């Protein structure tokens, strides 16, 4: 050991006197100082100090090593330098604080005298810091201990420690000086030392120069906070601001998107800012960008928006009197007010006249002075004043003119009165249609119990115009109130506008039958139960601990060191057939991973059962009480003889606690709605949490999600992905679900759709992916309340009362509600992809209005009783569009109540999870009880737990609205609810103009034949005899599973011409053979062909391409309907698509068509034609139609109402001799002709229907005159020919 110390001393001496130390290569050596520790890094093979262990060094007088634990390490980056005004922690500078590299509020840096080696030795003897650390290998240097040594090597060790300290001190100073030089070069600051420590290498000259620079810097900074040097500082600031805005159009955008910290720093650095004057300058200059920038960077209080200036004006006064509407509206939205001096019109007019007169007098005075004096310095200043007063004179004249030309505003528009609660009414309105050259600055709402508003019951003046909505509170329930609204501008109040309806009574739907609210007092009951359960736990835990202390013997403490060598439980890297819990912490695009770049995963159990539904539901409740995991573990006894369920719960608690300890946080986030499973037997329970910022975790780091996915993709096998692979693949969907499950609906009344499907072990609810915490819905209106009158109307309509008894006047209050319901039902059916004729058995839930929470209310739309919950293996009669999700019922209730009833669900989950665990424990105790006293105590405890469970279930049933609605919806006799057929007419769907995306149908052509029955019988007689199984069914149905046979319609009820079953089968064999999908391709331009026409046809018109592009988008050539269809109502005409695959089945006539296709509307049933061939004509939105006979061919047709026309499809009739070519299975190509409208149709009688060729034997379905007129017309070319490869 002595030899080793001598060797180290020689090496230290050599290293100190070497040229490398003098010339400075030590500057490249990296080391850090943290507190009083120095860490070294080997530079080359000659260096002996390795940066493997940090050493403590003795304190140096005037040195930089502080014993304070809060001192921060110094790095090689300028970021590690002390911040502004940071005080040195050296021990020798106790007389006066010395500040480092920055500005101090006191004195600048003072000179300090470096201490000699003698004084250092004196302090070394007084305090001996602990510098020893045990080394792991041989040859480690042992520095002096704090206690005096008794061995003979003490003197040598003391000398080594002193030399080592001096050496480290000099290195520290040189390194800090180099850091300051580097920082000064990069930032341009004055050179300054980074430490107040003094050493031999620090010269007095440099300190004197540095101190003077620091003083100058301090003085310059203190000058910035002095008083303004000129009263025109605000004008200069505005001028600079305007130049910035004019120089760059994105200046306002950049300032607008600054963070709050940047805005605060900008406010601090704005020198001599006079907010009120700057705002006045911006408004007077009509600079909208400057006004927006000032309002964003500063609050209205800082700008003194409502403080009048010396002329008695506010910024809003100038904006409205100059009729600057954009600036006035911005100021009004931020809370600006008019000047309080203008109490009347006369006072405003007199004030403006005074301002104009003063400005005019001042201009005249200055003009005379400028003309009398020559070119002097004072004259130049007066010229500037003259220009300023001339500009102000023009401003006041403009304000006076604007005031004189303005008039009082008109009545507010669209004033609507709504019943918002049983004691309040809400009035909404819009700005007047004409403000008469003056911005409206306030509104007045008045209400009275008499129609003539005499006397008034009250009024409200609205100064805050952020929202044009006013709620009148404190009203009497059931009392009728009349309300009117009037507007105000600088010319006074305008006329009042009565609301629509003119009166209303405050009420709520519960007033109809005096029902108690569903959500009342449940949270208080659960809080009381939770306190009782905790008290019971504490009582039994005290009894168990006392038994252990009195009867139990002292347990032996293991003195083995074996646990030191055992690896503690860490994160799982690979999954091996078990139950695991994974946690996803994310911030934007970053995700928390372990040090091995893995998702934090902990094993719960390696021998779990295949079904964990109940355990998962219990863990779902556990996710609402992460902070109680420790208490819950302590209250659960651990026994190897416990049941399997209890052992699984205990393992879940242990794994959760382990994950919390590894991550260093209690909150693990929310649970994903289902566990992730794979074919290897792994089950992964996932929790997700979004953090506010990138925290530093002890056992983790942050990584981009895309990078983690790419790394995992390169390592995983695509054949059999594990649950971890599935998690990474679907990570974006999981995060999207987590974000959207936290979102809430805006306040209002909604119409929801209740649809469930059941599996073997659970029931699932149909929700949207955008908002999985609520049912599929559409918004009815903004007002969430349903009044007593509206609810009474619904109840009457759900009974025997018909819609004819409802008053349909526009003034009727129920008419608006009826219209809103009608629109909401139609929109919801379209959203869930259900045609109206299939929804004829749907009805509204009339038992209650679901008051979800946060001013959100729901009415429910219920399917037919048999379709409310789809059983396993049962075909869904309708398939919704994409974007929907089947959420387990319990998970839906969790995320739903977490969003709308946070306090209740938190208490319920805590209480339910604890009581369920207690139930398992008491059952286990009851099984293990032997003596009578133990059995009695176990039964008593178990009965207490059962009582708790019963009380919790009662509270839960009161809040669980979905089960009540489900029970009501599945009740068949008697049929309850409001049928939607009283709200919307399903038979009118075919007459609508726009094509609903849910039906995808093609309108039919009326038949010219007076008897469809005769044609049908003739077609059947001409066809080959066949049975109904072979395709001679009277009504074509896609499949038996889609429609009920009882819903089949008789063709004599429909004004259609049908193809016979034989013809349909022949077409399927000829034109639609094969299973390849049909593809339409744009082909060359050709004319419409008739039997007597040239195949080339007439030449194309100039607008052919334009007309084709304009009308092709409205053609419906393929059936995009859902897979399945519900039953059809009588009187409906379901259309048929034109293209489809051949589907084999037991019915031969199904061979060429899939269930996607609807009825085919043809000119003639006896002529066979491929389904993809025909002429398609755009249907005009004006009055058009077909004549019933040739004499009426040119007459006007029936008027079709709607926003746009329907595309009408009709196939051409072909001669009999061409029918054989259609039966040729080798024919590969069919043509579709698109026929545009002629430009003369708007001004002439419509001739909309054309025939491709004359039909033989006089059986033309359309008059021949139409064909003869249209065929030679050169202005009606065929737009395009679409080729379909079949």
UniProtKB/Swiss-Prot annotation:
Residues 411-507 form the Fibronectin type-III domain. PROSITE patterns: ANK_REP_REGION, ANK_REPEAT, FN3. Residues 999-1011 have a biased composition (Polar residues). Residues 1260-1277 have a biased composition (Low complexity). Keywords: ANK repeat, Repeat. Residues 999-1032, 1086-1106, 1187-1207, 1242-1286 are annotated as: Disordered. It holds the Pfam family fn3. ANK repeats lie at residues 274-303, 311-340. GO terms for biological process: behavioral fear response; equilibrioception; locomotor rhythm. The keyword Repeat applies. Expressed in both the suprachiasmatic nucleus and dorsal medial hypothalamus. Disruption phenotype: ENU-induced null mutation in mice produce several neurological abnormalities, including deficits in vestibular function, fear learning and circadian behavior. Residues 748-755 are annotated as: Highly conserved peptide sequence. The keyword DNA damage does not apply. InterPro entries: ANKFN1, Ankyrin_rpt, Ankyrin_rpt-contain_sf, FN3_dom, FN3_sf, Ig-like_fold. May play a role in neuronal function. This is Ankyrin-repeat and fibronectin type III domain-containing 1. It comes from Mus musculus.
């Amino acid at each position: 050991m002595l030899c080793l110390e001598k060797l180290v001393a020689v090496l230290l001496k050599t290293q100190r006197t070497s040229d490398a130390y003098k010339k400075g290569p030590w500057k490249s050596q990296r080391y850090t100082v943290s507190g009083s520790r120095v860490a070294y890094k080997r530079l080359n093979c000659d260096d002996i100090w390795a940066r493997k262990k940090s050493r403590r060094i003795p304190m140096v007088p005037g040195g930089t090593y502080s014993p304070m634990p809060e001192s921060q390490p110094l790095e090689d980056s300028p970021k590690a330098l002390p911040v502004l005004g940071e005080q040195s922690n050296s021990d020798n500078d106790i007389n006066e604080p010395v500040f480092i590299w920055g500005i101090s509020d006191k004195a600048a840096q003072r000179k300090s005298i470096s201490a000699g080696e003698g004084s250092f030795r004196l302090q070394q003897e007084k305090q001996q810091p602990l510098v020893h650390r045990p080394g792991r290998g041989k040859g480690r240097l042992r520095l002096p201990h704090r206690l005096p040594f008794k061995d003979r090597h003490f003197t040598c060790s003391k000398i080594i420690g002193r030399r080592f300290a001096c050496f480290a001190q000099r290195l520290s100073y040189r390194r800090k000086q180099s850091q300051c030089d580097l920082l000064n070069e990069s930032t341009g600051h004055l050179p300054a030392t980074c430490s107040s420590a003094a050493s031999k290498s620090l010269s007095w000259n440099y300190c004197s120069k540095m101190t003077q620079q620091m003083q100058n810097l301090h003085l310059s900074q203190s000058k910035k906070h002095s008083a303004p040097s000129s009263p025109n500082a605000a004008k200069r600031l505005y001028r600079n601001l305007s130049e910035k805005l004019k120089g760059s159009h994105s200046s306002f955008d950049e300032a607008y998107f600054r963070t709050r910290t940047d805005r605060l720093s900008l406010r601090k650095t704005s020198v001599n800012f006079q907010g009120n004057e700057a705002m006045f300058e911006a408004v007077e200059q009509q600079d909208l960008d400057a006004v927006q920038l000032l309002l964003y960077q500063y609050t209205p209080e800082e700008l003194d928006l409502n403080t009048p200036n010396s002329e008695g004006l506010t910024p809003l006064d100038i904006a409205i009197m100059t009729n600057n509407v954009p600036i006035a509206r911005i100021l009004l939205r931020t809370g600006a007010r008019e000047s309080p001096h203008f109490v009347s019109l006369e006072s405003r007019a007199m004030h403006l006249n005074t301002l104009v007169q003063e400005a005019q007098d001042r201009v005249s005075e200055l003009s005379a002075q400028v003309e009398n004096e020559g070119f002097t310095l004072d004259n130049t200043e007066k010229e500037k004043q003259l220009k300023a007063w001339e500009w102000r004179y023009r401003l006041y004249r403009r304000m006076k003119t604007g005031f004189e030309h303005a008039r009082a505003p008109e009545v507010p528009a669209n004033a609507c009165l709504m019943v918002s609660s049983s004691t309040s009414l809400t009035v909404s309105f819009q700005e007047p249609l004409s403000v008469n050259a003056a911005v409206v600055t306030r509104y007045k709402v008045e209400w009275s119990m008499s129609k003539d508003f005499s006397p008034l019951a009250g009024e409200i003046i609205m100064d805050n115009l952020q929202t044009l909505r006013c709620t009148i509170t404190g009203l009497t329930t059931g009392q009728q109130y009349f309300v009117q609204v009037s507007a105000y501008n600088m010319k006074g109040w305008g006329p009042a506008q009565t609301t629509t309806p003119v009166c209303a009574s405050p009420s709520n739907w519960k007033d109809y039958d005096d029902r108690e609210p569903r959500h009342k007092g449940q949270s208080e009951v659960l809080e009381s139960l939770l306190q009782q359960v905790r008290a019971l736990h504490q009582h039994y835990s005290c009894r168990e601990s006392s038994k252990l202390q009195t009867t139990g013997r002292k347990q032996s403490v293991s003195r083995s060191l074996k646990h030191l060598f055992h690896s503690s439980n860490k994160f799982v890297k690979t999954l091996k057939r078990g139950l695991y819990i994974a946690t996803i912490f994310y911030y934007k695009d970053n995700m928390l991973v372990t040090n091995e770049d893995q998702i934090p995963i902990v094993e719960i159990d390696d021998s779990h059962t295949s079904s964990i539904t109940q355990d998962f539901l219990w863990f779902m409740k556990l996710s609402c009480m992460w902070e109680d995991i420790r208490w819950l573990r302590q209250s659960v006894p651990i026994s190897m003889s416990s049941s399997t369920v209890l052992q699984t719960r205990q393992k879940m608690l242990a794994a959760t606690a382990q994950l919390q300890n590894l991550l260093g946080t209690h909150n693990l986030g929310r649970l994903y709605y289902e566990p992730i499973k794979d074919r290897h037997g792994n089950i992964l329970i996932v929790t997700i949490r979004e953090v506010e910022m990138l925290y530093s975790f002890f056992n983790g780091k942050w990584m981009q999600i895309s990078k983690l996915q790419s790394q995992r993709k390169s390592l995983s096998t695509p054949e059999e992905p594990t649950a971890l692979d599935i998690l990474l693949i679907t990570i974006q969907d999981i995060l999207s679900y987590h974000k959207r499950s936290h979102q809430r609906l805006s306040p209002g009344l909604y119409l929801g759709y209740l649809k469930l499907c059941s599996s073997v072990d659970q029931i699932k609810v149909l929700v949207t992916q955008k908002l999985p915490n609520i049912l599929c819905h559409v918004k009815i209106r903004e007002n969430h309340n349903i009044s007593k009158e509206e609810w009474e109307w619904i109840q009457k309509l759900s009974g025997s009362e018909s819609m004819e008894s409802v008053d349909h006047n526009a003034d009727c209050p129920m008419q608006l509600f009826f219209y809103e319901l009608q629109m909401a039902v139609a929109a919801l059916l379209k959203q869930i992809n259900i045609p109206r004729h299939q929804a004829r058995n749907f009805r509204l839930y009339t038992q209650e209005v679901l008051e979800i929470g946060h001013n959100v209310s729901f009415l429910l739309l219920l399917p037919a009783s048999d379709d409310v919950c789809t059983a396993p293996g049962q075909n869904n009669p309708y398939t919704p569009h994409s974007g929907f999700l089947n959420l387990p019922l319990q998970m839906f209730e969790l995320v739903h109540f977490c969003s709308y009833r946070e306090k209740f669900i938190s208490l319920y989950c805590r209480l339910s999870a604890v009581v369920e665990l207690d139930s398992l424990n008491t059952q286990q105790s009851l099984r293990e009880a032997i003596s009578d006293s133990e059995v009695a105590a176990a039964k008593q405890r178990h009965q207490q737990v059962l009582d708790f469970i019963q009380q919790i279930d009662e509270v839960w049933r009161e809040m669980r609205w979905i089960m009540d609605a489900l029970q009501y919806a599945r009740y068949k006799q008697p049929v309850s609810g409001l049928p939607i057929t009283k709200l919307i007419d399903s038979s009118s769907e075919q007459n609508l103009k726009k094509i609903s995306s849910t039906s995808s149908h093609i309108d039919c052509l009326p038949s010219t034949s007076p008897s469809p029955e005769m044609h049908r019988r003739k077609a059947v007689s001409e066809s080959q005899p066949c049975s109904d199984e072979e395709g001679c069914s009277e009504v074509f149905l896609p499949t038996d599973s889609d429609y009920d046979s009882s819903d089949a319609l008789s063709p004599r009820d429909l004004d259609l011409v049908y193809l016979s079953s034989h013809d349909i089968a022949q077409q399927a064999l000829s034109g639609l053979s094969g299973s390849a999908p049909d593809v339409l391709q744009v082909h060359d331009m050709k004319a419409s062909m008739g039997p007597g026409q040239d195949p080339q046809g007439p030449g194309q018109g100039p607008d052919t391409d334009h007309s084709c592009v304009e009308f092709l988008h409205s053609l419906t050539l393929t059936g995009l309907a859902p897979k399945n269809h519900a039953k059809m109502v009588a009187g409906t005409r379901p259309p048929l698509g034109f293209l489809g695959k051949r589907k084999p089945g037991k019915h031969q006539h199904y061979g060429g068509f899939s269930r996607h296709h609807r009825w085919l509307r043809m000119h003639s049933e006896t002529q066979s034609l491929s389904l993809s061939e025909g002429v398609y004509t755009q249907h005009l939105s004006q009055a058009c139609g077909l004549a019933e006979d040739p004499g009426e061919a040119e007459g006007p047709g029936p008027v079709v109402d709607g926003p746009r026309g329907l595309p009408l499809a009709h196939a051409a009739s072909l001669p009999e001799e061409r029918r054989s070519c259609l039966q040729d299975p080798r024919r590969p190509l069919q043509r579709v002709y698109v026929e545009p409208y002629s430009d003369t149709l708007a001004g002439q009688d419509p001739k909309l229907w054309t025939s491709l060729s004359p039909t033989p034997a006089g059986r033309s379905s359309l008059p021949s005159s139409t064909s003869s007129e249209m065929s030679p017309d050169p202005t009606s070319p065929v737009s395009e020919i679409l080729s379909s490869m079949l």
